[in-house]
Regions:
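Glycine/charge-rich, flexible interdomain linkers and switch-proximal surface loops
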Residues: 10-20, 68
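Rossmann-like S-adenosyl-L-methionine
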Residues: 49-54, 58-197
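Extended interfacial segments that mediate partner engagement and assembly in macromolecular machines
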Residues: 1-8, 21, 26, 41
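Short flexible coil/turn linkers enriched for glycine and charged/polar residues
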Residues: 25-28, 82
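Short, aliphatic-rich beta-strand segments
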Residues: 21, 28-37, 94-98
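Short helix/loop segment immediately N-terminal to the Walker
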Residues: 5-13, 129
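Short, non-transmembrane amphipathic alpha-helical segments
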Residues: 1, 38-58
């Protein structure tokens, strides 16, 4: 209808690389993020008009990605409409999920898996837990309900922003999050811990 071409990885031409659709299984919120080979989406208003007719539509964004590789998402995103994120729950923990952050594709099964992990971890309330590659803090915040302290490490800054916001949303104050490579952050904080004890 708008004659917008899809991206061709071989030639590097075309605009629409991917369409990421996220759905909050418990909240019924929907996010659409179009990954584009450029900076803008022509005739975006027409697309927005159509998408907001869908029940539950909460966020419409674009993520520019002009790299000549097969990495899906760009390094940033622009909000075209809505709040720029959706929310969902795993158990009784609420999560804010932005376009660039990893979120489990099947939160219904994830809730069961995390419940088992929490049961098997048999946390008594005096443990310190490190969640390496923590994403938006799904496991971290789930375990923080039973642990004394939880630390999450993730290389994606937007995911850590979401993790910190998720801790705030849930009034969880025994979780801290760090941006960086796990293999660098963990030894640094372990050395600091050793000096203090």
């Amino acid at each position: 209808e708008n004659k917008i071409k899809s991206y061709d990885e071989k030639t590097g031409k075309g605009l629409i690389r991917h369409a990421l659709i996220r759905y909050g299984f418990k909240t019924k919120e929907i996010m659409v993020c179009l990954v584009v080979n450029g900076k803008k989406l022509p005739k975006a208003e027409r697309l927005i008009e159509k998408l907001i007719q869908i029940e539950g539509m909460t966020s419409i964004t674009i993520s520019p990605n002009t790299r000549r590789d097969n990495v899906i998402m760009g390094d940033s995103y622009e909000i075209l409409w809505g709040q720029g994120y959706i929310t969902d729950y795993i158990g009784n923990v609420k999560y804010q999920i932005s376009p660039l952050s990893f979120y489990q594709v099947n939160p219904v099964q994830t809730e069961k898996l995390y419940g088992l992990a929490l049961e098997y971890a048999d946390l008594k309330g005096d443990e310190t837990v490190w969640d390496l590659y923590c994403g938006i803090g799904t496991i971290s915040l789930f375990l923080a309900q039973k642990a004394k302290q939880v630390y999450g490490v993730e290389i994606v800054p937007q995911a850590i922003d979401d993790a910190k916001e998720n801790a705030k949303i849930n009034a969880i104050d025994n979780a801290e999050f760090f941006v960086g490579k796990a293999e660098e952050v963990l030894p640094e904080y372990y050395a600091e811990y050793e000096r203090e004890h």
